[in-house]
Regions:
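Bacterial N-terminal signal peptides that target proteins for export
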Residues: 1-12
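N-terminal carbohydrate-binding accessory modules
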Residues: 27-88
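Catalytic-core region of carbohydrate-active enzymes that cleave or remodel glycosidic bonds
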Residues: 309-322, 349-454
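Aromatic- and carboxylate-lined catalytic core of secreted/periplasmic carbohydrate-active enzymes
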Residues: 403-531
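C-terminal beta-sandwich/jelly-roll accessory domains of carbohydrate-active enzymes
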Residues: 489-499, 512-583
Length: 583
């Protein structure tokens, strides 16, 4: 028990501030920092943006395979491939085991080399600190940590096994890791404090307990039997109205108690006879992953993981205060129960617990590999919280999800995983005649389009002048108002044939002036009262250095004879449209 000392209550009390919407946090001295060129998060309307050198920055990223960045020689041929994919940012792992191979001896040659090559190739970096946990395990901890389980206690599973997983309840482990992370951040400030090649740092990777719902070690069980810390109870009492519905329901369904042990406040733990399974039969596969199973176990672990991560994060921020985030392996149809995904990680049900326990973390980022992309984005932007997608599939759906995340949910960035995998190149082009009216853009094409429109998009993010969307047969159209103009956006229709899928972003830059980007959709200007609106002019074109360069004037079939503003499914495009009014 001696290794599992309690943390300072003051740290968590400060963390309750993080539950507030970002605008309120800024007013209370929370999230926003002075503008000095250092990367920071800043509010613009309802959006939170990443600001670098005083300007908003949209991360068009790609995450390297886990081991790629461990060798500068291995990376040499990869850099040019990354540039060719129109990335502006690379997410690269930096591991505790290589930074501190011997206790107290730090080696930053690899970090220096990554930053040097990124600058040569005009790329930015987000560094991923693989410390105590990577995918719930502790494989990236130094060997001198692994061989000393007495000093660095491990999680114990319900079967008595103590796998290679450091326990988050150990303050000694947190303090030792925090020392290494602080050394890294101090070094980054020294070599990158002016150039700002490194935009953000991810602290740990997909933390949480696998193969059980919580730590069952004697020390952890002793803490589990004690009262819930007052600072965590304050979260439920003082911020009940803004809690995630799943978290609030878990507390209220157990009587909304104001004190007691973890089980008394949050309900029963995982039953002993329950066997975790990754494969569920239908329809359980579609329903169970949306439920909050054994809330007490996940809340208990979330609190302690968040507190541990905050010790590490705050140590780093004292040296160099740039945005830091924690990512989440999500509950999903293929892993519905805590332990089939890392229990206690920053999944949406316990995100508020993380924000309270880890006030140093600037945002919680979902790793999105599931079809329910928009549904889960919605969970993470609840109450105005910022969104970043650090991992996702590099699949034909990636362009669709990119436009949705950035245009609708104000994401600060998007980053498919395995961007350097030799076999993860763009999917082969499918002839339009074989696609059945479905767009088939590559990620490279989508990033190039997004790069062109980024200045305009970032200018209007957080306002009522922008929308992003995905369309399909189940959701073929919707009506929205942009800058006071009511429009209907639907699947493209031409020659009696409707597109099967569509995606895009539309921005109103004036009362009757619009820009759009995407494929497979059309826009109709709706009448308001006696005022009719119609398509005035449509030009396709490009942005060069932020300036609009028009190309073809589109009319006739390309505008359905003036009835709609069209984006054909045959290819990605940027277009400018003006509308006219008849009173």
């Amino acid at each position: 028990m001696s290794a599992f000392r309690f943390r300072s209550a003051a740290l968590a009390a400060a963390g309750v501030l993080c539950l507030l919407p970002p605008s309120a946090r800024a007013a209370a001295g929370g999230v926003d920092r002075p503008i000095d060129g250092t990367p920071q998060l800043r509010r613009q309307g309802t959006a939170t943006q990443l600001v670098v050198d005083g300007r908003p920055f949209l991360i068009l990223g790609g995450e390297l395979l886990n081991s790629s960045s461990s060798s500068l020689e291995y990376m040499q041929p990869i850099w040019d491939r990354l540039v060719a994919q129109h990335l502006n940012t690379v997410l690269a792992a930096v591991s505790w085991e290589l930074v501190e191979p011997e206790e107290g001896r730090f080696n930053f040659e690899l970090v220096d080399g990554l930053i040097r090559e990124a600058r040569v190739h005009q790329l930015r970096l987000v560094l991923l600190w693989f410390g105590a946990w990577k995918n719930g395990l502790s494989s990236y901890a130094p060997v001198w940590v692994k061989r000393d389980p007495k000093r660095f206690p491990r999680v114990q599973l319900d079967n008595g096994d103590t796998p290679e997983r450091l326990s988050p309840l150990s303050l000694d482990s947190a303090a030792v890791e925090a020392r290494a992370f602080a050394a890294l951040m101090k070094h980054l400030r020294t070599i990158d404090g002016r150039e700002h090649t490194v935009l953000m740092v991810q602290v740990e990777n997909e933390a949480g307990v696998l193969n059980d719902s919580r730590d069952r070690s004697p020390a952890a069980e002793a803490v589990f039997a004690q009262p819930v810390p007052a600072e965590l109870m304050n979260l439920f009492v003082q911020h009940k109205e803004t809690l995630a519905p799943e978290l609030r329901q878990a507390w209220e369904s157990n009587g909304a108690k104001l004190s007691g042990s973890w089980a008394e406040v949050f309900g029963p733990t995982k039953p002993k006879e329950f066997v975790l399974t990754w494969d569920l039969p239908e329809p359980l596969r579609q329903t169970e992953w949306r439920k909050f199973h054994w809330p007490v176990d996940e809340i208990f672990m979330a609190w302690h993981y968040a507190r541990y991560v905050n010790v590490v994060t705050e140590a780093g921020k004292r040296e160099y205060n740039i945005p830091m985030y924690a990512n989440a392996w999500l509950q999903q149809p293929g892993g519905a129960y805590p332990g089939t995904y890392p229990s206690g990680g920053p999944v949406f049900q316990v995100a508020d617990v993380w924000r309270a326990g880890a006030p140093g973390i600037d945002l919680l980022a979902p790793d999105l590999y599931v079809p329910e992309f928009g549904e889960l984005c919605e969970k993470y932007v609840r109450a105005g919280h910022p969104l970043f997608i650090p991992e996702t599939n590099r699949s034909p759906r990636a362009p669709f999800n990119l436009f949705l995340a950035v245009g609708k949910y104000n994401a600060i960035g998007f980053s498919p995983f395995g961007i350097d995998w030799p076999f993860s190149g763009p999917p082969p082009a499918v002839p339009a005649s074989e696609r059945g009216g479905a767009p088939n853009p590559t990620l490279e094409q989508s990033y190039e389009i997004m790069r062109q429109i980024a200045p305009l998009l970032l200018q209007h993010q957080g306002t009522d002048r922008i929308t992003g969307f995905n369309l399909d047969k189940d959701n073929p159209s919707f009506v929205t108002t942009l800058g006071g103009t009511e429009i209907e956006i639907g699947l493209d229709l031409a020659f009696g044939r409707r597109a099967e899928q569509g995606f895009g972003i539309v921005i109103a830059v004036g009362p009757d002036e619009f820009y759009g980007a995407g494929a497979g959709f059309c826009v109709i200007f709706r009448p308001v009262g006696k005022t009719r609106r119609g398509v005035g002019t449509v030009d396709e074109g490009v942005f060069r250095d932020g300036k609009w360069i028009p190309g073809r004037r589109l009319n006739g079939d390309e505008t359905d004879q003036g009835r709609s503003w069209r984006f054909a499914p045959s290819g990605l495009a940027i277009e400018r449209c003006t509308a006219y009014r008849i009173e």
